[in-house]
């Protein structure tokens, strides 16, 4: 993993919006977040990737697939995975990005699992990286207390004791509950200039959706794999972590 050095505490945020350390901690469990001052999304992704490669004890040229999950790429194109490829020297890898916000890494991992299971690729580098500080409205208390910048990476290969089961769902009808507008909304023919889109969230709706749907997904994957909740350690469950309450 990799996080930038700059720390923004809850007390720092209390100088920007009407909030305080106790309010944030009691509702989210968050005490501080990291904010990038010099790193780009691909910089953070590459630094996390380099650490994962080193820990895996492999040569970067052994990697034949790179999947980067991000909602804040450096460019529209080339994709961020290609930038990571160049920075870590994984010259033999096919590269693409996945945009799925909070669930991005889970979707990227499941995609790598499918490719490796099919035999098409052998060694995948899966990365989740976001520079959300540039998408957050720092005057919006409902979002600015929740998000920061950072990256995590994993080297994925086939193994007998690997992924036991997957359960993926989407509900596009709820997309407006947590969203960030496109920054290419201008139209030169109509004289409309692009507007900066910032993240917006209906917190209660997100909470209600998560507490209902996530347990159902867990139940489904347990049934599909012939397991029970009692038999599975939480350390073997990979899901999006939102806050201490969720």
Show where each model-derived region lies.
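Phosphate/pyrophosphate-binding loops at sites that engage ATP/ADP/AMP, CoA/4′-phosphopantetheine
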Residues: 48-63, 217-231
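Flexible, glycine-rich active-site loops centered on histidine and acidic residues
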Residues: 117-151
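Short acidic capping loops at alpha-helix termini that bridge into adjacent secondary structure
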Residues: 59-65, 92-94, 122-124, 228-233
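Conserved catalytic cysteine-centered active-site region
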Residues: 23-27, 31-43, 71-124
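Conserved small/polar residues in nucleotide/adenosyl-binding loops
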Residues: 235-242
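Short beta-strand segments
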Residues: 69, 99, 124-130, 156, ...
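Condensing-enzyme catalytic core mediating Claisen C-C bond formation in acyl metabolism
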Residues: 1-38, 140-208, 212, 216
């Amino acid at each position: 993993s990799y996080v930038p050095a700059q720390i923004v505490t809850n007390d720092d945020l209390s100088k920007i919006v009407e909030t305080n350390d106790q309010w944030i901690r009691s509702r989210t469990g968050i005490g501080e977040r990291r904010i990038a001052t010099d790193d780009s999304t691909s910089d953070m992704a590459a630094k996390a990737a380099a650490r994962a490669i080193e820990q895996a004890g492999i040569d970067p040229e052994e990697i034949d697939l790179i999947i980067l999950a991000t909602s804040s790429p450096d460019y529209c194109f080339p994709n961020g995975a290609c930038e990571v490829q160049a920075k870590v020297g994984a010259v033999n890898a096919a590269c693409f990005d996945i945009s799925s916000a909070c669930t991005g890494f889970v979707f990227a991992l499941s995609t790598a699992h499918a490719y490796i299971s099919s035999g098409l690729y052998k060694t995948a580098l899966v990365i989740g990286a976001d520079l959300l500080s540039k998408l957050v409205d720092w005057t919006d208390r409902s979002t600015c207390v929740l998000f920061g910048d950072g990256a995590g990476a994993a080297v994925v290969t086939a193994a007998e004791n690997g992924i036991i089961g997957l359960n993926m769902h989407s509900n596009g009808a709820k997309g407006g509950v947590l969203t960030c507008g496109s920054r290419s909304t201008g139209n030169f023919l109509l004289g409309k200039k692009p507007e900066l889109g910032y993240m917006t969230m209906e917190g209660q709706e997100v909470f209600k959706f998560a507490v209902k749907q996530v347990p159902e997904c867990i139940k489904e994957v347990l049934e599909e794999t012939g397991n029970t909740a009692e038999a599975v350690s939480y350390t073997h469950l990979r899901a999006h972590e939102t806050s201490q309450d969720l």
